[in-house]
Regions:
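Short beta-strand-turn/beta-hairpin segments enriched in glycine/proline and small hydrophobics
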Residues: 1-11, 28-45
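Acidic, glycine-anchored pre-beta loop/turn
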Residues: 17-23, 53-59, 63
């Protein structure tokens, strides 16, 4: 099981995954905006077990965004 972490504090702009979805290492999972800069979050290949945030949520650095098996 792998935790997908936020690279920085900011706001979730996009959530591009849902539970049960199979992802690859090139998939853009989330977009986190901080100080008007957008940062794309990628993850390890696997199946999304749970998504813990939604668009508009404020997140902290290293906060768990999703769990992938």
């Amino acid at each position: 099981m792998t935790e997908i972490l936020s690279p920085m504090a900011g706001r979730i702009q996009e959530v591009n995954i849902e539970a049960g979805q199979t992802i690859t290492e090139d998939d853009e999972l989330f977009i986190v905006e901080a100080m008007k800069m957008e940062n794309v979050v990628y993850g390890d290949p696997g199946v999304v077990k749970e998504v813990l945030v939604k668009a508009g949520d404020d997140v902290e650095e290293d906060q768990v965004l999703a769990i992938v098996e």
